[in-house]
Amino acid sequence: MALLGLAVAAVAAYAAQAGVSSGGGRCATYRPHIPSHSQFSKVIDNPYFPLPAGRTLIYRGVENGRKELDRVHVTSRTKRIEGISATVVDDNVYEPIGRLAERTFDYYAQDDRRNVWYLGEDTREFLPGGKVDTSGSWLTGRNGAKPGLIMEADPRVSDAYRQECRSGEAEDLAWVVDRGGSNRVPYRTFHHVLRSLEFSRLEPAIVDQKVYGPGVGAISERQLSGGHETLSLVRVTG
């Protein structure tokens, strides 16, 4: 209950900070301070969101009673977005295990202060009957889309920020609620973890708690409201 209360406070706090209301202009008034092209590095080594080429992370969990597997692979490929060279991450969700339910290519870049920027995603959800849903896809510079931060260089409790911004398609936000402590997942126990609440203006009833471990990145996810989903890190290679 306490975390749900924090989630509500986070939405209100961020709306006030960003100068937008929950039903207002949203991305139109959002003006991120994007560093110049020369201020982006070639590697992403933020302790809470490292993306070394070749690394693969495997997560297992349950969504609304169905088992799922999430395979996240950091490719060696890059994509140039608005002059910035972004690392391409290939994220595949299998639900039930064995059936590819969703495939997403995410694009990230790190500035020289070690903030990790989220520059866009190409997502495909595979529906019954061979249909493919691409809603949620966005790319910085197209259709008014703007980048957000997926991880700050030095995240602090009470920090709130946009992770992505394309009105009506991608409006995820994050609020840091704890830094420190330990968290055990099947892969191993992590110390000095970071916890955040993540939510979207498009689905305000859904609030996720995510935990990030130093040196690895996301290690667990749990839906606190709006559904029943859990994911935990089980293996890391590369």
Name every feature range the model reports, one short phrase each.
Residues 1-18:
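Secretory targeting and sorting signals
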